[in-house]
């Protein structure tokens, strides 16, 4: 039996709740001009059902319900370290990034977050691994073109299928639909590594809470599959360290690298520091670096 409720009159057919064995309430709400469908199981006699609200989408394959949270964490143990693609940075990190962990690259515009991520992606592809790159800020063609300046050639990697770049406008759909596409792509591509550029754009999916839930679910999916997950965040405040993630997920990230820019003597200098890297003996110093036509070079102290 289906019943249409009237807004502001939830008790219009209240007597049906007592008659039915199972009651499911579905609705559609609009937050920040982004529509989201959600359902909640109000009652289900004789069943230990989930009591939270769950987002769902209606697609060509019918209804897809995407639980945001899970009662049990089933993350795989971190694997061996893999190179960042930059030998000097590997030394700063204590040997590189650990496979299957989460990495946050945070910094102001122009600091080199995308460049650093693409250096890693290229190195991984050349090792024969697959990388999924989700971009919320520029098209695949634009990314490939812009990376030519620091000498990072991505086009051949895309042709071989080792690098898969997908671009979406955050506000084009709700967080649940973005999540559905991300999880589907993970199952289709089977990457060893994933990059999300940038998480600061995810707020445009409807709300900060929706962005947080999306990023948490993607992170959990990656850790369950043993996929290294890179999050890039654009810090817009004057204190980059204070705005590491902007969405409140930095505490669950395994490795945090902060990139900053300083104006010294009339010129702009860039520096990075590894704020934390679980399970590794990383450097605790600031390291100056330059973006050249050969990628990223760390300046010797």
Locate the predicted segments by residue.
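Flexible loop/N-cap segments at domain edges
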Residues: 84, 89-117, 161, 166-168, ...
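Walker A/P-loop NTP-binding active-site region of P-loop NTPases
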Residues: 92-154
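Glycine-rich phosphate-binding loops of nucleotide-dependent enzymes
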Residues: 113, 135, 192, 196, ...
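Conserved inter-motif catalytic segment of the P-loop NTP-binding fold
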Residues: 129-213
């Amino acid at each position: 039996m289906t019943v249409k409720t009237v807004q502001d009159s939830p008790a219009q057919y209240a007597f049906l709740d007592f008659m039915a064995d199972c009651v499911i309430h579905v609705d559609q709400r609009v937050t920040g001009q982004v529509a989201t469908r959600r359902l909640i199981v109000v009652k289900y006699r004789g069943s230990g059902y989930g009591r939270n609200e769950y987002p769902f989408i209606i697609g060509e394959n019918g209804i897809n319900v995407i639980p945001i949270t899970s009662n049990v964490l089933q993350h795989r143990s971190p694997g061996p370290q893999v190179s960042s693609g930059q030998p000097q940075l590997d030394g700063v990190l204590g040997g590189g990034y650990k496979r299957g962990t989460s990495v946050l690259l945070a910094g102001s515009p122009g600091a080199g977050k995308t460049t650093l991520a693409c250096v890693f992606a290229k190195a991984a592809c050349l090792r024969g691994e697959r990388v999924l790159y989700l971009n919320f800020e520029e098209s695949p063609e634009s990314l490939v073109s812009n990376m030519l300046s620091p000498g990072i050639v991505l086009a051949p990697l895309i042709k071989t299928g080792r690098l898969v770049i997908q671009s979406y406008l955050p506000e084009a759909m709700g967080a649940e639909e973005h999540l559905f596409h991300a999880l589907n792509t993970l199952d289709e591509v089977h990457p060893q590594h994933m990059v999300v550029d940038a998480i600061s754009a995810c707020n445009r999916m409807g709300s900060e809470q929706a962005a947080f839930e999306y990023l948490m679910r993607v992170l959990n999916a990656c850790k369950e599959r043993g996929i290294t997950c890179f999050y890039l965040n654009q810090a817009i405040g004057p204190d980059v360290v204070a705005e590491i993630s902007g969405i409140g997920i930095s505490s669950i990230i395994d490795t945090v690298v902060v990139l900053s820019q300083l104006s010294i003597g009339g010129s702009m200098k860039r520096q990075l520091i590894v704020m934390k890297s679980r399970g590794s003996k990383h450097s605790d110093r600031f390291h100056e670096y330059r973006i050249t036509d050969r990628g990223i070079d760390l300046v010797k102290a």
